[in-house]
Amino acid sequence: MIRLGVNIDHVATLRNARGGTFPDPVAAAELAIASGADGITAHLREDRRHIRDADMPRLRALSAPLNFEMAATDEMVRIACDLRPHACCLVPEKRQEVTTEGGLDIVGQSEALKPKIARLRDAGIRVSLFIDPEARQIETAAALGAPVVELHTGAYALGGSEELERLRSAAGTVAACGLELHAGHGLTYDNVGAIADLTGLAELNIGHFLIGQAIFDGLGPVVRKMKSLINS
């Protein structure tokens, strides 16, 4: 069965638009878990534009595993090692971007990433790397000791059969390298099926669509439907 990680960042975006504490992303996470989510994903960005530091321990205390998305900075590594979530996913981060625009270039940053990955693993945290579906990136992830890669599906979500073929090829490389395969970004009811069919896929992390669709259908029904679709 493919696991569904629900990203609750944009509940925090809505909260922060007015200040205060409502809507509470932790309450949304609890509802997602009760509705079948296998885990919760939260991205504590350097600019704190949605998730706040105070949210993270509360999310860590929930019954489902927490996947802490983070930039590969000394500050975030320290926070993660103190928090000790189930998993950390290292992602690229630019202050001017609206959302994560591509995968982490681990080939170009391998020397800087190696000690950070080692420190997180020494803290008992499962490390994943959010990367584009390229063989060199996947092979470098394996060489760096990361047990998981999350393939960036954003280009596929924008359309194009060529992108799906890249993802299929990448899934084969992930398997050949002995890594666990995750995927995410831009996935919806309409496009998730082909990604769920990738060979060896263990987990999907989906956020923006689920929170947006929940405005119309409610978060519980949306999570249940997505969980059903990815395992049908």
From Swiss-Prot:
Active site: 43, 69, 185
Main location: cytoplasm
EC number: 2.6.99.2
Protein's GO biological process: pyridoxine biosynthetic process
Compartment(s): Cytoplasm
InterPro entries: Aldolase_TIM (IPR013785), PyrdxlP_synth_PdxJ (IPR004569), Pyridoxine-5'_phos_synth (IPR036130)
Pathway info: Cofactor biosynthesis; pyridoxine 5'-phosphate biosynthesis; pyridoxine 5'-phosphate from D-erythrose 4-phosphate: step 5/5
UniProt-annotated binding residues for 1-deoxy-D-xylulose 5-phosphate: 9-10, 45, 50, 99
Disulfide bond entries: none
The protein's assembly and partners: Homooctamer; tetramer of dimers.
Summary of the function given for this chain in its UniProt record: Catalyzes the complicated ring closure reaction between the two acyclic compounds 1-deoxy-D-xylulose-5-phosphate (DXP) and 3-amino-2-oxopropyl phosphate (1-amino-acetone-3-phosphate or AAP) to form pyridoxine 5'-phosphate (PNP) and inorganic phosphate.
Protein name from the UniProt record: Pyridoxine 5'-phosphate synthase
Gene name as annotated: pdxJ
